[in-house]
Amino acid sequence: MFTNQDFEIFNDQTLAGRMHLIKTVIDPKFEQVAPTIITSLQTPGEPPFYAHVAKHLRRFKNPPVDTWVAFSQNKRSYKAWPHFELGLWPDRLFIYFDILDECKPAVQAKMQLADLTPLLKALPAGYVISNNHGVPATQLATPANITQAIKKFNQYKHSELVVGRAVLVGDPLFENADTLNKLIIATFKQLLSIYQPVMAAVSAERQA
């Protein structure tokens, strides 16, 4: 499972070097944990989830600033669908549910994101929220921050919704693989309550 040493891949400032470390150190861990996560997300009678390990194919000069595996009910892609992500920034491991820019129009066509407010506010302490998946910074998912994040999502064209948990480098959880794995699974299961109505809305829009 993930350890504090995994974050050392970001010390390599070259594209080739960091990509090699991602492929040989991090990606095998994503592939190892993916089946367990997929099983935890699966709902009887619903389409299966698929794991999408980031390939960083558009990187030609600068090394990736983060890396991840996404979980989507679309076999070919994930960015245009509500999805989950498990990944690493240089300072944290993240466990998130995402509505990215590519998915936003379909969500807004069929639902009011404010309808998710009660579900978001019911999240346990320690969850975080953001309007930009492309930066590591987040805010605690307090009622006030949730309200503000939903407002930004609705007001600004390229504003996204990211919510979940983050485990910072140096956290004792990285010394206990079993406990960390349980936290990852528990977080994704908790986020399912938010994912499901959003996915239903997007599916309805795509089938219209």
UniProtKB/Swiss-Prot annotation:
Record's superkingdom? Bacteria
An example Pfam family from this entry, by short name, is DUF1054
Instruction: Show the InterPro entries listed in the entry.
Output: UPF0637 (IPR009403), UPF0637_domain_sf (IPR053707)
Tell me the protein family, please.
Answer: Belongs to the UPF0637 family.
What is the protein name for this chain?
Answer: UPF0637 protein lp_2332
Organism from which the protein derives:
Lactiplantibacillus plantarum (strain ATCC BAA-793 / NCIMB 8826 / WCFS1)
